[in-house]
């Protein structure tokens, strides 16, 4: 048996995201202006931030702050809270003061809450021009208040609340209708000298959403907030968001994202962070490779992979672990990972850096992997092996007209 201890050697990086600060050979990020949401930059080449929204009653300050803490722990950069009532507006000062990440107030219907949110210390306010009463009249005042407070705004256009005139003109919430709504308000903001805003044009349909953002991206340099509205339950919404975001981010479109799921908000953040990690747009953390299992598997791969994932869920080092169930792909995949196991005949071969270091009984595989993985992760962190924070996509996108 090989008695050499691979952990004592400088550890090989595997699959770190490519540093895409250069323009070639991949598609560059779309050029956009930079705005600030509190201390978080959005646009202008800044790292793509992950957002979510609380589902508590905002007026319930302890519950809202608890959920914000959970979102922060999951990797959330910016949080949005709903403000449908006066009680919610009254809760904003304390929430903003105690939140560890920037708070955006989400305002519909009542423009008075916009001004209260600005006064409360919100880092930004989302306004929906489709349902705020007399928005054309109050818009300039909102811009002035935001300018005086030094905060940014988001023009949030949704298919479900599109202005009635635009709906009738374009025959529904088409890409052209959504973009027309966004441009109308963007030009109004800019006409009064306000430029610190980003835009979202959300639709529940993936194809329509992608077409809408492509069209909007060709019209100006505003930072774009990506989202598939009303995406659905966890599995369905995850698929929709990954398809839509993947298509756009691969073309350099998108400056901040929110995965909308009918699920606990922290799940939105986990999906968003992993999506960006896999596209090379966010520092990579722990990742697991596991086979789908088949008739050749001689171990319960599903249970084994789940146990390893759960045991390493809090690891932040960019360690990649392979859990394989047979000898067909097992040794090869395990050798390509930082740490891996190829299982069979009631035992598992443990690989580190492509070398077999030991063979253990099946009932010791999980504990062995967790122990070694934590040792490797600790060394990675001690050696300063942190993943590159990329600024562009890692796949070659399809060019499209107007971009």
From Swiss-Prot:
[4Fe-4S] cluster binds at residues 291, 294, 326, 333. GO terms for biological process: isopentenyl diphosphate biosynthetic process, methylerythritol 4-phosphate pathway; terpenoid biosynthetic process. Residues 1-16 have a biased composition (Basic and acidic residues). GO terms for molecular function: 4 iron, 4 sulfur cluster binding; 4-hydroxy-3-methylbut-2-en-1-yl diphosphate synthase activity (ferredoxin); 4-hydroxy-3-methylbut-2-enyl-diphosphate synthase activity (flavodoxin); iron ion binding. Binds 1 [4Fe-4S] cluster. Its cofactor is [4Fe-4S] cluster. Residues 1-31 are annotated as: Disordered. The keyword Iron-sulfur applies. It catalyses: (2E)-4-hydroxy-3-methylbut-2-enyl diphosphate + oxidized [flavodoxin] + H2O + 2 H(+) = 2-C-methyl-D-erythritol 2,4-cyclic diphosphate + reduced [flavodoxin]. It comes from the Bacteria. Pfam families: GcpE. Keywords: 4Fe-4S, Iron, Iron-sulfur, Isoprene biosynthesis, Metal-binding, Oxidoreductase. Pathway: Isoprenoid biosynthesis; isopentenyl diphosphate biosynthesis via DXP pathway; isopentenyl diphosphate from 1-deoxy-D-xylulose 5-phosphate: step 5/6. Its EC number is 1.17.7.3. InterPro entries: Dihydropteroate_synth-like_sf (IPR011005), IspG_bac (IPR016425), IspG_bac-typ (IPR004588), NO2/SO3_Rdtase_4Fe4S_sf (IPR045854). The keyword Metal-binding applies. Belongs to the IspG family. Converts 2C-methyl-D-erythritol 2,4-cyclodiphosphate (ME-2,4cPP) into 1-hydroxy-2-methyl-2-(E)-butenyl 4-diphosphate. HAMAP family: IspG. This is 4-hydroxy-3-methylbut-2-en-1-yl diphosphate synthase (flavodoxin). It comes from Bifidobacterium longum (strain NCC 2705).
